[in-house]
């Protein structure tokens, strides 16, 4: 569907102009109605699409006349004189600015046909400048395969260990199983033709379209396959002409922050040709093309609206689909493949989409292939050709008007009112195809037999002749290839290489991506501003913690800690870029497939677009920090500080981007990122100075970019400076003692001097030298360039992981025989089973006796302060053994009525009577009814049988024994025909149950609850293909036969589906009733009502559901002057309904209540007692964890690697001053796994909560207290296991156990250390639950938790001791849980043992004359501790400031005797977290209506 083709190479003027003729009519569509896209009502500009503008009120299309007209005009156009006369009358639409021109897409009189006619005439003036570019396609013996396994086992914590061999086989490629997806396809789609691809989900439609478009990611063509793109070989098409054949996937991925106008203008600019019309700039061209496409697709009114997505508000889903269509249109591809692009659209909009495609092919000569799962007859008739797929076999390819006859001649029967598309697809389902009498043994049955019948037919032979003729006309590598290359070259920028698939130059690609990048930033400026403000606040907090540091030696440690913090915060400010890159990756890959730009061009642009933010952030953060803390206040050092912090930011940004681009999934990126960050922090040079790094690990420091930045910042602060020793640090501090006999206690001090030189301090403490400062800058630049190169390379060549094809997963040991055949050859037996078992199961299905009826139901809510009525006096009833359809236009209130009747609304005012057997509903009503939601919400780790059992145990009455409930579940499984996959895992779409199996399970979960009153179903067939919809209706039929009362909403069913309902409740806009009553045989009762009241007669072939919408004026393009809700209110039918309701109320209320089980529990809100609720929830959540080995193993791997990394980095730390500091930092660094553990816990909780709140809470399965308690308790055993892992991997390598040996308390202190680690992990998990309890998104909860975690770390007493904290912040030191945790672990780990100085830590001072060192220092040692290395020396004393580790502990306000108290305080924090989590959930998430009840 190439609109760009109209001016570029893609034209066939003869076909295009001829197809429209001279009349101002609709573009003709074979067999269909005039397209609603031409010449519309000017007053309805925003709602009419341009398809409305090309011709209303036109006569029906006569195909023969049109073909004659095409021939006549084609002959005219071959004559040059005629061509020039057409051309000379043409105007240039790009330069047309008149408001009322029919060529102005923004004007009220725009006509797409006139615009196209002018454009075609213009391009025909100069065919060399605008050469034709067409790409029809022929294929012979097309076979495609992939690798994988048809069935797999679900992984859990135990059997994951058994996967090591499988992993090895996967890596070596020896374990691959070849799976044939497509077998021997043949076909021909010429330029200007449309092909519809029909088949059930899983039949190979998507693979076929991807193959045609050259998207061979994970799939492979067999060697014998021949593809001919009008002379171009498949490899050349994929490589050199990638954007000329495109695949439009079912999903709509766009940048949500961009407006629709900006999104489409970008697409137009990236494919803007070099050879434009004279005087038309690139900007004019792109803007005009965008406006034309938006006008044609009815998007003009959304030009400034954000595209949005599931989380960002923007245009509607239908409009977003049209944005995808417009983007593909603007790509200008002559061959387009559309995969189920009508999903989610009603039949009217689907038809409009098909007609749009038809218009494009007829005018622009594009080649289009479309897969549609539900096609109305009108939509089907738009296409030229059809191919039918059956489990990877092609069973037909040919003209759409010949397909039905091909199969009816073979012996199959098409039921009355079944559309041709449904008939063709039904042939691939053994349970649905109907064989004519006398043909039972003659017709094909299996896919292979169907394929053989097709191959042996005359239609196939004719197709092969056409393909051979086409291939002779366009031989591979023939003249047409050169013409195509020349036409591409006419489009490409001058400096773009000939073999490139891209249109604009690399410079232009980067420029356009940059413009778009700034538009995205503008569209989401709040995020950027919040990040800047957040970093500024963090700078203020840290600046206040280290506020106005003294310029003396007492600030040495604080300055080091401050610079360490500063360089880390700058370095890791880009860590979130990993998430950002993953969010945009599908969009970039899609647009690269459209050949809009190189992925690396977007990568360069995104870096450049981030620069203003990074520079602004660096200035704001670093200036605030620098001047608040009194760092070196000289111009030179200040700018050097800014330079190095910014270069660190940029270098680490490149590193994080490389990680993101090099991995195929987010989880692959996050685990190495977590370990990498830990390593970068430890080996920066502050936590372990370089002189203390172990020889085998020193290389990590060399590979740490942050280490070079930290060294330069330290040198920048201390080089060439002189620091006065504070009076408290002069040793000994005797009054009257001479300075010559004193020394400053700081490393680098010289005896007899009250000053310490910064260079001496750096050299002796860290082995840092001034000569390294600028060398380090060069090294950092080298790192930056290296990571930049790897990032750009990875971006260009590594694509995102693609999902596997549909496979069933089973629990190990529960594999069902024949399960692999569930979707293949066992269909017949599965159908027979359903029919056989239904009678047996009927005895178990509870036959409902109660009648649910309602009268005058109204529902009012306030929207923006204005009252609005959603439902308006709705009456009706549902009786046992009947199925009532609830229909209406979009927005009529169908789902709202279901929610109101099912007591599921939590806001607004509901009035009217809703009665069960004439009595008001009690609080057990919700659990006594089943409600099948439109979305199939299930826990992905559970099996089908477990999901049903969970529902039965918790929702069936308490007096029913557990065994009876389990037996009933087996009956439900038989009834639903789910035996073959009863032990299959639900999984996620694509890896687990398919769409139909999910829908059956959704219904089964409600049936398992044994609903005593009725079953509500909301859109059970929405988004399903026709065959799956039919099987769901089969199921509903079975249920009604067994006495179930069913009320079911349905959206525009086919005629055959509609006939299967007993009654209809039909709503108009505003929730007003249009009809309630019997449907009747062949819809006669319904049709009679409407016809009597002024509706046109129902045509024999019409779909009553669509006819009904047209009658009331609710279908697109229809209008009604009759007020149908008013007609209903005055009708005798409504009077009869009211009388019957009054009769039901009076007679049923006299019925005696069944007292056999009407004890108190029958009327309780929940069927099961709290203990049963909690037990079942615990079992399910624990099994979810057990069956999510990725979660458990990633948690374990994180704990093991982090603990070992820290343990061996600080291996056997000595009890020297630096060694004790290292041991303190080993505890401090262990705290950093907090953030990663929180990020792992929150998504699991959100998954459980989403299921509970959407399905299980409204159905009263269990209470919110059981839900919260189970989710908190399930973490306990895993945290206990992780605490053992951390204890072993961390405690012993560091050697903390050795400090307990002198006091003979190894066991007691080891046990306490393990308990403290356990309390840390429990605090982490309960804190995560507290943070996420009231918050919707795991990302938001994670960010908030990390912010609070950072504050806890800053104020825990390690980086800034309580003595150095400003008075204002002391409260934070006291409320930080890590204060007590670190203090308890430090005291337990190093207390009550001797300390020994390293050689460099001894202070060398001179005693007074004739005095021994011992005599001189004994008083000081008695007061402050320490020891002398040489007691009797008289010339130079070597003094160590600490002799006991308790001296070190007291310096950081940690005391050995407080260790058990600190453990108790940690438990107080844990209890607080649990209480707060429960309270926050109750406050934020429990609906007001149920707060008093739950």
UniProtKB/Swiss-Prot annotation:
It comes from Aspergillus oryzae (strain ATCC 42149 / RIB 40) (Yellow koji mold). Pleiotropic ABC efflux transporter involved in the basal level of azole susceptibility. Confers resistance to miconazole and clotrimazole. Glycans are attached at residues 41, 141, 340, 622, 835, 1410, 1432. GO terms for cellular component: plasma membrane. Pfam families: ABC2_membrane, ABC2_membrane_7, ABC_tran, ABC_trans_N, PDR_CDR. It comes from the Eukaryota. Disruption phenotype: Leads to strong miconazole susceptibility. Residues 1-48, 84-105 are annotated as: Disordered. The chain crosses the membrane at residues 527-547, 561-581, 636-656, 669-689, 778-798, 1191-1211, 1227-1247, 1276-1296, 1312-1332, 1351-1371, 1463-1483. GO terms for molecular function: ABC-type transporter activity; ATP binding; ATP hydrolysis activity. InterPro entries: AAA+_ATPase, ABC2_TM, ABC_trans_N, ABC_transporter-like_ATP-bd, ABC_transporter-like_CS, ABCG_dom, ABCG_PDR_1, ABCG_PDR_2. This is ABC multidrug transporter atrG. Residues 162-416, 852-1095 form the ABC transporter domain.
């Amino acid at each position: 569907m190439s609109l760009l083709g109209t001016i570029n190479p893609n034209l066939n003027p003869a076909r295009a102009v001829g197809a429209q003729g001279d009349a101002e009519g609709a573009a003709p569509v074979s067999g269909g109605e005039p397209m609603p896209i031409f010449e519309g009502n000017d007053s309805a500009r925003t709602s009419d699409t341009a398809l409305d503008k090309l011709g209303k009120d036109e006569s029906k299309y006569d195909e023969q006349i049109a073909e004659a007209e095409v021939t006549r005009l084609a002959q005219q156009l071959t004559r040059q004189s005629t061509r020039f006369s057409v051309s000379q009358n043409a105007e240039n639409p790009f330069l047309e600015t008149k408001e009322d021109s029919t060529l102005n897409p923004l004007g009220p009189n725009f006509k797409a046909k006139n615009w196209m006619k002018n454009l075609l005439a213009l391009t025909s003036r100069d065919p060399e400048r605008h050469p034709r570019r067409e790409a029809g396609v022929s294929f012979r013996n097309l076979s495609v395969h992939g690798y994988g396994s048809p069935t797999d086992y679900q992984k859990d914590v135990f059997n994951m260990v058994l996967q090591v061999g499988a992993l090895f086989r996967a890596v070596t490629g020896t374990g691959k199983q070849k799976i044939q997806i497509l077998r021997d396809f043949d076909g021909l789609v010429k330029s200007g033709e449309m092909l519809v691809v029909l088949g059930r989900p899983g039949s190979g439609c998507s693979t076929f379209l991807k193959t045609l478009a050259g998207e061979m990611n994970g799939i492979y063509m067999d060697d014998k396959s021949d593809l001919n793109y009008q002379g171009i070989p498949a490899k050349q098409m994929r490589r050199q002409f990638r954007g000329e054949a495109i695949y439009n996937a079912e999903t709509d991925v766009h940048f949500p922050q961009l407006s629709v106008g900006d999104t489409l203008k970008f697409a137009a600019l990236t494919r803007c040709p070099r050879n434009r019309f004279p005087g038309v700039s690139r900007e004019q061209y792109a803007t005009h093309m965008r406006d034309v496409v938006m006008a044609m697709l009815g998007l003009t009114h959304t030009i400034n609206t954000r595209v949005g997505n599931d989380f960002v508000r923007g245009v509607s889903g239908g409009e977003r689909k049209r944005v995808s269509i417009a983007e593909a249109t603007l790509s200008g591809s002559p061959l387009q493949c559309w995969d189920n692009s009508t999903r989610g659209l009603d039949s009217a909009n689907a038809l409009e989409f098909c007609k749009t495609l038809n218009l494009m092919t007829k005018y622009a000569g594009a080649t289009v292939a479309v897969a549609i799962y539900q096609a109305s007859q009108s939509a089907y008739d738009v296409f030229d050709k059809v191919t039918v797929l059956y489990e990877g076999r092609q069973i037909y390819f040919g003209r759409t008007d010949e397909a039905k006859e091909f199969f009816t001649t073979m012996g199959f029967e098409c039921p009355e009112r079944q559309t041709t598309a449904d008939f063709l697809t039904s042939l691939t389902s053994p349970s649905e195809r109907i064989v004519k009498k006398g043909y039972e043994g003659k017709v094909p049955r299996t896919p292979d037999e169907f394929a053989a019948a097709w191959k042996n037919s005359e239609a196939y032979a004719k197709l092969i002749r056409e393909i051979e003729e086409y291939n002779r006309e366009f031989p591979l590598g023939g003249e047409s290839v050169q013409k195509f290359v020349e036409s591409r070259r006419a489009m490409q920028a001058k400096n773009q290489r000939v073999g490139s698939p891209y249109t604009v130059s690399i410079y232009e690609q980067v420029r356009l991506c940059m413009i778009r990048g700034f538009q995205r930033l503008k569209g989401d400026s709040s995020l950027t501003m919040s990040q800047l403000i957040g970093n500024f606040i963090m700078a203020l907090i840290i600046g206040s913690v280290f506020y106005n540091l003294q310029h003396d030696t007492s600030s040495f440690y604080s300055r080091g800690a401050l610079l360490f913090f500063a360089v880390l915060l700058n370095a890791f400010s880009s860590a979130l870029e990993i998430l950002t890159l993953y969010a945009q990756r599908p969009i970039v890959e899609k647009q690269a497939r459209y050949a809009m730009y190189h992925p690396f061009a977007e990568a360069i642009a995104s870096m450049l677009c981030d620069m203003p933010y990074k520079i602004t952030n660096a200035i704001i953060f670093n200036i605030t920090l620098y001047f608040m803390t009194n760092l070196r206040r000289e111009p030179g050092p200040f700018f050097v500080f800014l330079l190095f912090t910014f270069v660190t930011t940029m270098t680490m940004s490149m590193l994080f981007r490389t990680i993101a681009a090099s991995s195929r999934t987010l989880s692959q990126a996050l685990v190495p990122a977590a370990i990498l960050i830990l390593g970068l922090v430890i080996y920066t040079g502050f936590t372990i100075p370089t002189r203390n790094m172990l020889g085998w690990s020193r290389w990590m420091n060399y590979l740490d970019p942050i280490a070079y930045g930290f060294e330069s910042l330290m040198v920048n602060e201390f080089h060439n400076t002189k620091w006065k020793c504070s009076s408290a640090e002069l040793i000994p501090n005797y009054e009257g003692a001479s300075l010559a006999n004193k020394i400053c206690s700081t490393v680098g001090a010289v005896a007899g001097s009250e000053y310490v030189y910064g260079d001496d301090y750096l050299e002796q403490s860290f082995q840092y030298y001034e000569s390294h400062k600028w060398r380090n800058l060069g090294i950092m630049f080298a790192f930056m360039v290296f990571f930049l190169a790897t990032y750009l390379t990875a971006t260009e060549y590594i694509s995102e992981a693609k999902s596997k094809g549909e496979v069933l997963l089973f629990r190990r040991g529960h594999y069902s025989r024949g399960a692999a055949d569930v979707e293949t050859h066992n269909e017949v037996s599965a159908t027979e089973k359903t029919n056989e078992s239904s009678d047996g199961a009927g005895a178990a299905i509870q036959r409902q006796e109660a009648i649910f009826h309602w009268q005058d139901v109204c529902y009012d809510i306030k929207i923006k302060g204005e009252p609005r009525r959603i439902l308006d006096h709705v009456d009706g009833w549902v009786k046992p053994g009947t199925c009532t359809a609830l229909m209406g236009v979009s927005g009529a209130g169908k789902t709202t009525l279901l929610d109101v009747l099912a007591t599921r609304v939590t806001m607004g005012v509901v009035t009217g009577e809703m009665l069960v057997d004439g009595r008001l509903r009690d609080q057990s009503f919700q659990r006594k009814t089943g409600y099948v939601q439109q979305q199939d919400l299930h826990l992905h780790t559970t099996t089908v049988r477990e999901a049903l059992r969970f529902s039965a145990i918790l929702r069936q009455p308490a007096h029913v024994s557990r065994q009876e409930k389990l037996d009933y579940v087996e009956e439900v499984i038989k009834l639903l025909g789910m035996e073959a996959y009863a032990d299959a895992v639900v999984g996620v779409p694509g890896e687990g149950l398919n769409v139909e199996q999910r829908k059956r399970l959704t219904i089964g979960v409600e049936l398992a609850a044994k609903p005593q009153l009725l079953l509500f179903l909301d859109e059970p067939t929405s988004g399903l293909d026709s065959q799956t919809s039919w099987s769901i209706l089969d199921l509903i039929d079975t249920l009604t036969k067994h006495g179930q009362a069913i009320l079911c909403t349905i959206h525009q069913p086919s005629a055959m589906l509609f006939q299967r309902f007993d009654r209809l409740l039909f709503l108009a806009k505003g929730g007003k009733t249009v009809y309630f009553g019997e449907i009747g045989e062949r819809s006669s009762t319904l049709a009679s009502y409407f016809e009597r009241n002024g509706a046109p007669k129902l045509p024999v072939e019409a779909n009553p559901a669509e006819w009904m919408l047209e009658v009331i004026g609710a279908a697109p393009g229809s209008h009604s002057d009759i007020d149908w809700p008013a007609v209903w209110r005055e009708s005798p039918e409504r009077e009869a309904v009211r009388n019957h309701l009054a009769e039901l109320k009076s007679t049923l209320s006299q019925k005696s209540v069944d007292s056999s089980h009407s004890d108190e529990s029958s009327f309780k809100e929940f069927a099961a007692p709290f203990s049963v609720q909690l037990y079942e929830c615990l079992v399910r959540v624990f099994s979810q964890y057990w069956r999510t080995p990725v979660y458990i193993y990633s948690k374990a791997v994180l704990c093991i690697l982090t603990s070992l990394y820290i343990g061996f980095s600080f291996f056997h730390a000595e009890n020297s001053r630096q060694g004790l500091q290292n041991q303190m930092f080993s505890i401090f660094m262990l705290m950093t796994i907090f953030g990663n553990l929180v990020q792992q816990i929150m998504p699991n909780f959100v998954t459980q909560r989403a299921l509970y709140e959407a399905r299980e809470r409204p159905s009263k399965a269990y209470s919110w207290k059981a839900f919260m308690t189970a989710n908190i308790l399930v973490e306990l055993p895993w945290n206990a296991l992780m605490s053992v892992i951390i204890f072993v991997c961390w405690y012993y390598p560091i050697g903390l156990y050795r400090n307990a040996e002198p006091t003979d308390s190894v066991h007691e202190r080891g046990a306490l250390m393990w308990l403290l680690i356990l309390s840390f992990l429990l605090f982490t998990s309960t804190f995560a639950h507290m943070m996420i309890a009231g918050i919707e998104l795991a990302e938001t909860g994670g960010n908030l938790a990390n912010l609070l975690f950072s504050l806890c770390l800053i104020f825990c007493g390690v980086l800034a001791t309580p003595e150095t904290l400003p008075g204002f912040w002391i409260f934070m030191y006291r409320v930080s849980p890590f204060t007590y945790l670190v203090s308890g672990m430090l005291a337990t780990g190093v207390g009550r043992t001797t300390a020994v100085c390293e050689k460099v830590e001894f202070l060398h001072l001179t005693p007074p004359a004739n005095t021994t060192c011992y005599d001189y220092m004994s008083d000081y040692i008695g007061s402050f501790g320490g020891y002398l290395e040489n007691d009797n020396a008289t010339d130079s004393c070597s003094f160590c400031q600490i002799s006991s580790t308790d001296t070190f502990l007291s310096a950081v306000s940690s005391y050995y005797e407080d260790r058990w108290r600190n453990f108790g305080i940690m438990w107080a924090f844990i209890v607080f977290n649990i209480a707060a989590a429960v309270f926050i959930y109750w406050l934020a998430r429990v609906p007001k209506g149920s707060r008093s009840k739950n």
